[in-house]
C-alpha cells in the first residue's frame, strides 16, 4: 500500500498550482461560526495557515491514506514573516467582531500539519501567535494540532506559560484505538502506546487533550466502521480526554481513498452510522460530564462527504441533529432520530448494513 500511496502523492503534488506573493501572505481560510465551548455554547474562530505542509505527507511513507491537505501547502520552506502575515490578516479581519460579540470564543489554529514542527511554524512565530491570543479575554479556549513526534516538554511549557489563562487543547489525530487499522489501513505512522505516552506528557504540563477519531477508514464496511468508532469513543471516554472530535471520512483529492472511491470500492459513511455511533457509545448523559464530543463533518450532505441519499431534506435534517447535539451536549438530541426520519433510504441502509 505504501508504494501506491507514494505514487498517488507524487502525482498529486505535481498538480499544486504556483502561488503568488499575495497567496503566501493570506491564510488558506478563516471563519467564525457557532461552536461548543467546555461549559457553554459559544463561537469558534478558525484560521488555517499555509505552511510547507505535513512532514509525514511529504516523506517516504507517502502520508495518510485519507488526507489530501498537503495540496493546500506551499511544499517549500516558508519564511516566518509570511506565516505571521497570514495570521495577522485573519486576526485583523475578525478581532473587532470577536471583541463585540456576546459569546465567548474558542480559537483553532490549523496548518494542515503540525503546529509544533519547526519546519512549518517555528518558535518565533508560535510566540507571536501566543502573544496576540493572550491579549483577548473573549478567547477562552485554544486548539492546535500536531503529530506526536513534535510534542516535547519545552514546547508545551512555553505554550502554557504564554496562554496560562486559557483552556488549551493539543489535538492529535489518533483516528482509531485499533493499531492494525491505524497502521495498515490509514498509514498513520502512530502506535497507541506512543499516543498514551504523549497523553501523559500533555497532562503533566496541565494542558488538555483533543482526539480526532475517523468514522469509516478505507477497507472497512459500514458495520465494521461503526464497531471501530464506538470502541474508540468508549476508550477515549475511559481515558478522560477533554474532547473527542469524530470526523467522518470526506473524500479528498489526491488520496488513496479518492482512488478507491473512483473505482467504486469505497463509499463515505452514512449519517445513520454517525448517529448509531453516538448512541451506542454515549449510553448516559453522565458520560459527557468530563469529555465533550463534537463532530463537524467536512463535505456533509455531498457525494464526497458523509451522506444518506440524494435527498437534501434527509441530509439537512441529519446535519441539524448532529449540530444540535454538539452545541448542547444533550444526549436526548440523538435519541430515536432514525424513527423520526421518513426516507426510503433507511431500508437501503439497513440492507447494506446487514449484508454488505
Which role fits each region the language model picked out?
Residues 30, 36-85:
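Canonical Radical SAM [4Fe-4S] cluster-binding loop centered on the CxxxCxxC motif
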Residues 43-47, 105-109, 142-144, 168-172, ...:
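Hydrophobic faces of well-ordered beta-strands that scaffold small-molecule active sites
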Residues 70-90, 94, 98-123, 136-151, ...:
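Core AdoMet radical
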Residues 64, 135-138, 227-245, 314-341:
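Structural recognition of alpha->loop->beta junctions
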Residues 193-255, 275-297:
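Conserved C-terminal portion of the radical SAM core fold
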Residues 94-102, 129-137, 157-167, 200-206, ...:
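Acidic (Asp/Glu)-rich catalytic clusters
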Residues 1-18, 26, 251-356:
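Auxiliary Fe-S-binding modules of radical SAM enzymes
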Residues 119-127, 152-162, 223:
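Distinct, well-ordered alpha-helical segments
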